[in-house]
């Protein structure tokens, strides 16, 4: 049948997590875009809503308890280097509990809170798309 994102376009989600005008970014270990800074996210499971998938993936990757998510917009990434194609819905959350941590060291190696003028490089295409959706009042 094949693998989503590799043999045919995959459906994914990403979650922008904001605190005090800063975005939470993680450094990826694996494809797509290894060594790039990105937002938490992943694939949507069968019969799972995209909002629930965004919450689940973010909780698994960050250790945070995500309370509410709101739709931010769509993103599409065609990574020629990794031969992956993902169509994702991006969500945003500023209502959460806990402190972020690295819960999946095989997937993510570092994290931090970043303002618009201190974004780490290189940024993943998903992170760039998410940041483009944010206004100056969201990300300072």
Where are these regions (language model features)?
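Active-site-adjacent beta-strand/loop module that shapes the phosphate/pyrophosphate-binding cleft
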Residues: 75-100, 130, 134
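Short, charged/polar surface micro-motifs in flexible loops or helix N-caps
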Residues: 18-23, 31-33, 45-46, 77, ...
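Short connector loops at helix/strand junctions that flank enzyme active sites
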Residues: 10-12, 18, 39, 66, ...
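NUDIX/MutT-family hydrolases
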Residues: 92, 101-133
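Conserved Nudix-box catalytic region and its N-terminal flanking loop in Nudix hydrolases
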Residues: 22-60
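A short coil-to-beta-strand element that immediately follows conserved catalytic motifs
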Residues: 65-73
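Conserved N-terminal beta-strand and adjoining loop/helix that marks the start
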Residues: 1-23, 74, 92
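A generic structural micro-feature
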Residues: 5-9, 36, 81-87, 105-108
């Amino acid at each position: 049948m094949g693998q989503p994102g590799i043999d045919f376009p995959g459906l994914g989600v990403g979650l922008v997590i904001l605190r005090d005008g800063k975005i939470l970014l993680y450094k990826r270990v694996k494809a797509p875009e290894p060594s790039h800074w990105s937002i938490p996210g992943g694939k949507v499971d069968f019969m799972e809503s995209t909002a629930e998938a965004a919450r689940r993936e973010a909780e698994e990757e960050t250790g945070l308890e995500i309370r509410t998510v709101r739709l931010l917009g769509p993103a599409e990434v065609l990574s020629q280097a990794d031969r992956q194609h993902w169509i994702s819905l991006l969500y945003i959350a500023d209502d959460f509990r806990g402190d972020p941590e690295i819960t999946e060291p095989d997937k993510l190696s570092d994290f931090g809170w970043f303002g618009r003028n201190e974004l780490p490089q290189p940024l993943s295409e998903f992170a760039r798309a998410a940041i483009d959706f944010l206004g100056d009042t969201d990300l300072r």
